Amino acid sequence: MLQIVIDNLEALKLDYSRFSVQKNYFNSEMISITLICSFPNKVGELTIWNDLSRVKEWIDYETEKINCLERKEFDTLENLINDLYLFIEECC
């Protein structure tokens, strides 16, 4: 399931000067991926888990405080990927 998300990200040809992707493993199994979006004053992170849930957070660089933290669960992979696209739009 996470490989489909990664394939979608690769198809977008993101600007990797602003975005980075981190794959997280447990016992050699990929359990989540994190899309990180960097701005001069804040960073956004969207972590997608293999159970069709995601956590989105925005962190202020100066204070290192989380400005927004949101967890959401999805019933389909398509809805999760649509939410991923919304996060990417927020970052542009």
Report residues per predicted region:
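Negatively charged, low-complexity tracts enriched in Asp/Glu with abundant Ser/Thr
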Residues: 1-39, 62-77
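Charged interaction patches that mediate protein-protein contacts
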Residues: 29, 89-92
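Short, charged/polar, Gly/Pro-enriched secondary-structure boundary elements
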Residues: 41-44
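Short beta-strand micro-motifs enriched in acidic
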Residues: 47-51
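Amphipathic beta-strand/beta-sheet edge segments enriched in Tyr/Trp
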Residues: 53-63
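Divalent cation-coordinating acidic motifs and surrounding scaffolds
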Residues: 81-90
